[in-house]
Design a protein with these regions (language model features):
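Conserved catalytic cores of very large enzyme subunits
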Residues: 1-194, 211-489
Length: 489
């Protein structure tokens, strides 16, 4: 590990140990794939219900709502959890605690609804090969709850309160036009219900913070007050907003947030610059906030890592790398962690010293860093119809997928085995695992007199697999999933 030069302590050993035990006990067995089923330290019981009590309450509420629209069911169950979960404002942490984080809503929402969506999709398209593709290792088609990215720009400029106001204003405009549908009315009502519950939750956190007198309490209280009333004002406010949104979306509503900001450096930079210029916080204090923020994701232990990205290019061609980009790398290196994982958007305008810094970190042991070729991202998105500006500002998410900011929705997950179509060329479309015809009939391989014809047959097989695999999702899966979630992503 290459030592970075901080002449101040980023996080005390006591606080670090505390956060490392916030989500699960370090001295107990742990399965990262089941990370949300654990708890670390105990929360104040007076702040809310236990997990079991909340699950019993959800059972009772879901029973009352069983004949209601999915929008209504989801929004009411979501609100119930935020109203009743235990909370924490701790002397060892700058970030809030939410106790019930095991997606307990799933029993009544995602679990039954996705089965319903698959059944309806299969019925709509007839004899779908989706199950056979899965059994044979050819392809997998699933509803995707794991690759969402919220509109961080709107959240950073409006906050939770401003998003709700924008929703109400949009509703008023559509309502006054006389063109609003019954379904739109219901969607508005339920989306409003969820954002009101979220704001109420933040107000509950704020009220609880006022009962604390430890050194961090005043800073936490002021930040929560900002988020109760409007948009984030400081770097710390924005970090707290990102964290709260992440926990509520990922662990309550079951939509994984697969990027922390539109580039963590670029989302935070306006706040960072303002904080320094107006002397709200020093660089040292901001460094600590970022360190405590990163430690949350390290401590959660997500087995596939929590991503965020840095760098990139502005539409005018200038680099998006800034002072904070370097500082974030330094903090990450100093902490010696591998989760969250960092994606760096690189192109010709990326400063070489920034790339070399990341490379030195990798050589020194900070190996959870990947480089994403921005030129390829831009070309690929523009081929799909995106403008240059939109493609340049594309968000990197998940492993290292990319998408347009606030203009795309990733709700279907399709994975393909590129070798299977090759097998189908040799077998005439028959699968050697299931014994079924999963491809198409093509000529016997011995009849091909050129590689080009062989390759054309391969592409034909692959094209068939792709279209058969995505057909159920195109037919019904998307509509059903949108029926599940009134909270926009």
């Amino acid at each position: 590990m290459q030592e970075r030069f901080f002449n101040y302590e980023l996080i005390s050993d006591t606080d670090r140990s505390f956060i490392e035990n916030k989500y699960h006990r370090q001295d107990m067995p742990f399965d990262g794939k089941q990370r949300m089923k654990y708890h670390g330290y105990d929360y104040d019981e007076s702040t809310g219900l236990s997990d079991r009590e909340i699950m019993l309450g959800l059972d009772e509420l879901a029973k009352k709502l069983e004949n209601e629209h999915h929008y209504t069911i989801k929004s009411e169950l979501f609100s119930y959890i935020l109203d009743n979960t235990r909370i924490d404002i701790n002397e060892h942490d700058y970030f809030i605690g939410i106790y019930t984080w095991d997606r307990v809503i799933d029993k009544h929402t995602i679990d039954p609804w996705q089965k319903e969506a698959y059944a309806k999709a299969t019925l709509a398209v007839g004899n779908s090969k989706r199950n056979d593709f899965s059994k044979s290792g050819t392809a997998w088609a699933l509803l995707d709850f794991d690759h969402t990215v919220p509109d961080w720009e709107s959240l950073s400029t409006l906050g939770f309160v401003g998003i709700l106001e924008r929703l109400e204003n949009s509703y008023t405009v559509v309502k006054s036009s006389g063109s609003i549908t019954e379904k739109q009315e219901l969607f508005y009502k339920c989306a409003k219900r969820e954002y009101e519950a979220l704001i109420k939750f933040v107000k509950r956190l704020y009220a609880y913070s006022l009962t604390k007198s430890h050194p961090k309490a005043a800073i936490v209280s002021e930040s929560l007050k900002h988020l109760c009333e409007g948009a984030p004002q400081t770097t710390y406010d924005m970090l707290q907003l990102i964290y709260i949104y992440f926990m509520v979306s990922e662990s309550v509503e079951h939509y994984q947030v697969r990027s922390l900001g539109y580039g963590l450096d670029n989302t935070l930079y306006p706040f960072y610059k303002s904080d320094i210029e107006n002397r709200r916080f020093s660089k040292e204090e901001i460094s600590r906030f970022i360190a405590y923020f990163m430690m949350q994701f390290s401590a959660m232990g997500n087995y596939w890592g929590q991503p965020f990205y840095l760098g990139g290019t502005n539409p005018d061609g200038s680099t998006a790398v800034n002072e904070l980009s370097y500082l974030i790398l330094d903090i990450y290196d100093k902490l010696g962690i591998y989760n969250p994982k960092i994606q760096i958007k690189v192109c010709k305008s990326t400063p070489k010293d920034f790339v070399f810094k990341a490379l030195r970190m990798i050589i020194g042991g900070s190996t959870s860093i990947v480089f994403c070729n921005e030129d390829i991202i831009v070309k690929a998105l523009m081929r799909s119809g995106a403008t240059y500006d939109d493609a340049t500002l594309a968000v990197v998410k998940g492993c290292y997928e990319y998408a347009l900011r606030a203009k795309s929705i990733g709700i279907s997950f399709n994975t393909f085995n590129a070798l299977k179509p090759l097998c189908f060329v040799f077998s005439g479309g028959y699968d050697n695992v299931t014994g079924k015809l999963l491809g198409i009939h093509t000529k016997d391989v011995s009849e091909f007199d050129s590689f080009e014809k062989f390759y054309h047959a391969y592409l034909a097989q692959f094209d068939y697999v792709i279209n058969e695999n995505i057909l159920p999702g195109k037919s019904h899966g998307r509509r059903s999933l949108l029926g599940c979630s009134p909270w926009g992503h």
